[in-house]
Amino acid sequence: MQDISNHTPMIQQYLKIKSQYQDILLFYRMGDFYELFFDDAKKAAELLDITLTARGKSNGESIPMAGVPYHAAEAYIAKIVKKGLSIAICEQTGDPNTSKGPVERQVTRIITPATVSEEAFLDNNQDSILVSIFEKNNKYYLAYTSYTQGKIYLVKTLTSLNELKNTVLKLSPQEIITNSRELAQQNPFKKPIKALEEWYYSNFEAKKYINDSLDTNIANNILNLYKNDKLTTIGSILSYLTNILKDTPRHITDISYEQEQDTLNIDINSRINLELDNNSKSSLLSIIGKCKTSLGSRLLKRYFSNPTRNLNILATRHSIINSLGENQHFLKIQDVLSYISDIERIISRVALGTVKPKDLVALRDSLEQLPILKKLLSEKNTPEITNINNRIHQLDELVTLLDKAIIENPPTTIRDGGVIKEGFDKELDELKSIKDNSYDFLIKFEELQKQKTGISTLKVGYNRVHGYYIELSKQHADKIPTEYVRRQTLKASERYITEELKNFEDKVLSSKEKALAREKLIYDTLLKKVIEYYKQIQETAASIAEIDVLANFAERAIKLKLSQPKFNNLAKLELKEVRHLAIEHNIDEPFIPNDTLLSKDTNTLQIITGPNMGGKSTYMRQVAQLIFLAYIGSFVPASYADICDIDTIYTRIGASDDISSGRSTFMVEMTETAYILNNASAKSLVIMDEIGRGTSTFDGLALAKACAEKFAQIGAFTLFATHYFELTELAKQYPNVCNIHFEAKEYKDNIYFMHKAVTGAAKKSYGIQVAKLAGISQDVLESAKQNLYNLEKKQQLTESTQVQAQFQLEPTTQNPLQQKLDAIDINTITPLEALNILFELKKR
């Protein structure tokens, strides 16, 4: 630590505390403000758009300073946290009246992007995820916590950086911690990440924090169930939370292991390509996700992150969707759900000590809806719905307690009181009555003093600095009674106090202090009572989320005309009248649906040709989106869907330069293609859109053919769109390859797209007609037509087009004469040998 002896005592204190939190902003409490100094002040001024000032000098230099009001700090902190930064809150813990030198201060809380619970800091519809990555021997052990959910999840051991990146980005964490400084420095995730000290990833410390933080039975089970490396990863989260909270994270009550083999895997590029869950209005999530509660919205996002292949789970979801869809019963349920607040996060705030009085009112109002919800669910007497209903706890006793205790519209915090309802506590009511009755006393006292002095302008008042006073103008100085003691002198008046008024003041102020202390005690006792229901409320919240998602699926099924998918073990994917929901939603004319059939018994690879804008990309995407929807338990946009076991969806759709890594569009395309080729299996769905465009025609065609052949050999269900018509010949070479194309019609030099998939290969690409639609000028179009004529008839425009025209899909063999000539070593051959070879070649 640098020498700080030349600084003022207060700045010395600040620098000592700041040295422990060098990488985060320090909010240093001074009176009614949080102040920031030096580099923190400069950074905060820029981030928060607040004034950067200076606080005198220390060590001979001006001290940069910026600050935010204590009462408004939450809004400023929210801005910082949402930018991925962390904050240390340093409060005054000493008594200013007894302190010698600077008031004692301590960091009471650290706020990081993933460890916040206050409503202002959180996205209601998204989990707050903290990921821990433990790197050891080129393996990655990963765990994560949904902070306000009170759970830790273990993920399977990962063996490659690419696999790690896909897993982490799928979770979309707010914050990442790791033991690897190299990983933190590289940050391939582009998320807030920090490398922690080694002890956070000590197996000994991990077991200690597991025992200290978790219920004894849970801790023992975890210690017996998992090996050291997984325990280390769990322990790193618990130790980090303990350090952040400055307390044991008792709200963590569950640790579970995610079974990777039960999920449909989709890498991050494919998620982006398919527009599954990004923030755009055309994403699948924005169309499917119409949940009524934040609880349901977050659960739906978890479904999107981890689609399940467990057919029992899917059958249960489908059964509930059908039941709720009968007579549109979901409408009644959704109406009740719309009145239920985020009780999962509210009870977490109670456990973490960040709950606000209004949260308790919201909790009460939400719990009041549970009897109605349970009655509606009981009307659908199916085992699946009954199971959910049994996990919704009707907490009438807690509702009654909160209703009696908290006023209807409480203040933001308990700090100044005014939260507890009159009649709840007799002692508190008595203390408040002293203050409430003070007005009557002051009116009578003022009237008595006016009579006593004969001064009609005499006033009795109060301010926070000087307390109660009697105010008289200076012109009445000769009428001041002897018992009046001067308290304050103003420009035109004097303020006095009497012994009677002083006694009243002491009594009132004492009652205020006692009432506030009593109210805080009642409030704390109330919170302890509420926390007794923690597990029941968490379980209730989870069940409400589940029924919200499934009611949403039922509503979407009717609104969007979705049908229930079937699942088979016959290696067959049969889809009829499939639609693309986003496009259907955004166009005025009717959407043209298409059928898809892929089967191990017929064909597994479709070569798809046809004009741009003809519907090839839409066709491929809608198949992938349908399978995805089926595996989250939703109904699907098709009149019929029979789906086999698909374990992974891969897509290669579009590309752009990766400038930061120095990679061209073609390099990005080839990297993604290599990943798919190396990982695809017979249980994969592969979407390949126009591969080989970023290089020469010859190279592109060769690569596209080789990739298509590989997918045919693997047996992966593959939709392969291409402009290389030569690839349609593959259907003659491979029995599991077929051709389909999208038709277009020409009429009076215009083109009309049919958007219908038809068996066979396309005969034209209609590129010039599409260019016309795009607005290319007529002179350029005429020139293009002439060029096309030359290419098709003369094939002499350029050397490369000659090569393309002559290019055959079959492998070429070298001429035997050429082989013989290549084998001759002209440096060692004799003239006689040369004549003999020439004679032999001539005979051939």
Curated annotation (Swiss-Prot):
InterPro entries tied to this protein: DNA_mismatch_repair_MutS, DNA_mismatch_repair_MutS-lik_N, DNA_mismatch_repair_MutS/MSH, DNA_mismatch_repair_MutS_C, DNA_mismatch_repair_MutS_clamp, DNA_mismatch_repair_MutS_core, DNA_mismatch_repair_MutS_N, DNA_mismatch_repair_MutS_sf
Protein residues bound to ATP: G610, P611, N612, M613, G614, G615, K616, S617
Any one annotated GO CC term: cytosol
This protein's UniProt keywords: ATP-binding, DNA damage, DNA repair, DNA-binding, Nucleotide-binding
Single GO MF annotation: ATP binding
SMART domains linked: MUTSac, MUTSd
Domain of life: Bacteria
GO biological process entries: mismatch repair
HAMAP family cross-referenced by the UniProt entry: MutS
Family the entry assigns: Belongs to the DNA mismatch repair MutS family.
Function summary: This protein is involved in the repair of mismatches in DNA. It is possible that it carries out the mismatch recognition step. This protein has a weak ATPase activity.
Name under which the protein is recorded: DNA mismatch repair protein MutS
